[in-house]
C-alpha cells in the first residue's frame, strides 16, 4: 500500500497503472525498475533527498524507485509518493523481482 503525491510525475505514473515492473537492487539503498516510458516532470524540482519508504522517479533513466536507505540529494530524483506497506518485505527480495503497481 502507499499513496502518490500531487505532482506531474505521480499523475503521469497513475495514467500507466496497472503496470508490472521488474525491480533490482541498487547500491543496497534502493530498488529500481524501468518504466515503459519516461514520466512528465513539469514543475518538479531539479532534484530531491528522498526518505526511507519514499517512492521516487529517477528521470535520467525513467526508473521507478523504492527507497529503503539514505541516498542523499541527487539531481534527477523526484519524490512521487510513499510506501505505507512492509519495507522489510521489499528488502527480502535480494535479486530481481516483479511487482504489479496498481491503483487502490
Label for each model-derived stretch:
Residues 1-15:
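Short, surface-exposed binding/anchoring microloops in extracellular/periplasmic proteins
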Residues 59-83:
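Beta-strand-rich cores of mature extracytoplasmic or soluble domains
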Residues 5-7, 18, 61, 69-71, ...:
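Solvent-exposed coil/turn segments that connect beta secondary-structure elements
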Residues 15-62:
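Mature extracytoplasmic domains of secretory-pathway proteins
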Residues 13-15, 58, 72, 91-93:
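A generic structural signal for short, solvent-exposed coil/turn residues
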Residues 5, 24, 100-102:
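A structural detector for beta-sheet-dominated domains
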Residues 80-104:
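Well-ordered alpha/beta subsegment
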Amino acid at each position: 500500500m502507499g499513496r502518490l503525491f500531487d505532482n506531474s510525475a505521480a499523475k503521469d505514473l497513475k495514467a500507466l497503472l496497472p503496470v508490472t515492473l521488474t525491480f533490482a537492487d541498487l547500491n543496497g539503498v534502493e530498488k529500481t525498475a524501468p518504466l515503459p516510458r519516461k514520466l512528465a516532470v513539469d514543475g518538479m524540482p531539479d532534484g530531491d533527498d528522498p526518505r526511507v519508504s519514499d517512492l521516487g522517479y529517477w528521470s535520467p533513466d525513467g526508473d521507478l524507485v523504492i527507497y529503503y536507505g539514505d541516498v542523499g540529494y541527487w539531481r534527477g530524483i523526484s519524490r512521487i509518493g510513499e510506501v505505507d506497506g512492509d519495507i522489510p518485505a521489499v528488502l527480502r527480495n535480494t535479486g530481481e523481482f516483479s511487482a504489479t503497481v496498481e491503483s487502490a
